[in-house]
């Protein structure tokens, strides 16, 4: 019984000692603060103005996500554009994300960052690209059909075999001398 009591006291002493060595704030240093979370959905113009100021936006540009129960709160609804569309030569505070300090990030930034979806406009419209692709495929199918209907072969001579045209292999009599086959003329 005394050994068990000593073991419990030892564990309690170790827990108290480790609390004094490690700062208590180290555990929560990586968590998001209360100011980083979206607030409640703005209902009045004053709440909209306060939310726009919170996200460093003008009141005219601020548009929150609809209050449909998804938990967006007062977070601004930014355009669905990828980071590719932002100026690469601008001096960004975070060049990897092409963001400045204090600028609100898109709610789905993990989808619209530079190594994922690129929403940049394409140089050609979709129907032109589809016409080019399907036109090329139709041309290749047509050419394969033409090659199948009108085959082209390299001109070849009759097959030549060594050892007097394989006389013994084709069942010739080994006691007789086969007739000499000449494959060339000089």
Curated annotation (Swiss-Prot):
Role played: Accessory subunit of the mitochondrial membrane respiratory chain NADH dehydrogenase (Complex I), that is believed not to be involved in catalysis. Complex I functions in the transfer of electrons from NADH to the respiratory chain. The immediate electron acceptor for the enzyme is believed to be ubiquinone.
Keyword Metal-binding: no
Gene Ontology BP annotations: mitochondrial electron transport, NADH to ubiquinone
Family: Belongs to the complex I NDUFB8 subunit family.
Quaternary data: Complex I is composed of 45 different subunits.
Keywords of the record: Electron transport, Membrane, Mitochondrion, Mitochondrion inner membrane, Respiratory chain, Transit peptide, Transmembrane, Transmembrane helix, Transport
Sections of the chain in a coiled coil: none
GTP-binding as UniProt keyword: no
Bilayer-crossing regions: 133-153
Gene Ontology annotations for the cellular component aspect, listed alphabetically: mitochondrial inner membrane; respiratory chain complex I
InterPro entries on file: NDUFB8, Ndufb8_metazoa
Protein name: NADH dehydrogenase [ubiquinone] 1 beta subcomplex subunit 8, mitochondrial
Domain of life: Eukaryota
Targeting presequence: 1-28
Membrane topology classification: Single-pass membrane protein
Main localisation: mitochondrion
Subcellular location: Mitochondrion inner membrane
Upper classification of the organism: Eukaryota, Metazoa, Chordata, Craniata, Vertebrata
């Amino acid at each position: 019984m005394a050994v068990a009591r000593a073991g419990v006291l030892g564990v309690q002493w170790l827990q108290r000692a480790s609390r004094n060595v490690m700062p208590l704030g180290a555990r929560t240093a990586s968590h998001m603060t209360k100011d980083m979370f979206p607030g409640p959905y703005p209902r009045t113009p004053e709440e909209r103005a306060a939310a726009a100021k919170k996200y460093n936006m003008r009141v005219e540009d601020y548009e929150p996500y609809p209050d449909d129960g998804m938990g967006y709160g007062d977070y601004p609804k930014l355009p669905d554009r990828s980071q590719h569309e932002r100026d690469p030569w601008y001096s960004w505070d975070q060049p990897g994300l092409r963001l400045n300090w204090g600028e609100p990030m898109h709610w789905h930034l993990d989808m619209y960052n530079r190594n994922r979806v690129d929403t940049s406009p394409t140089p050609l419209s979709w129907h032109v690209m589809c016409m080019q692709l399907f036109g090329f495929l139709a041309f290749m199918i047509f050419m394969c059909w033409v090659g199948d209907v009108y085959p082209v072969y390299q001109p070849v001579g009759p097959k030549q075999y060594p050892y007097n045209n394989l006389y013994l292999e084709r069942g010739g009599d080994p006691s007789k001398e086969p007739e000499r086959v000449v494959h060339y003329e000089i």
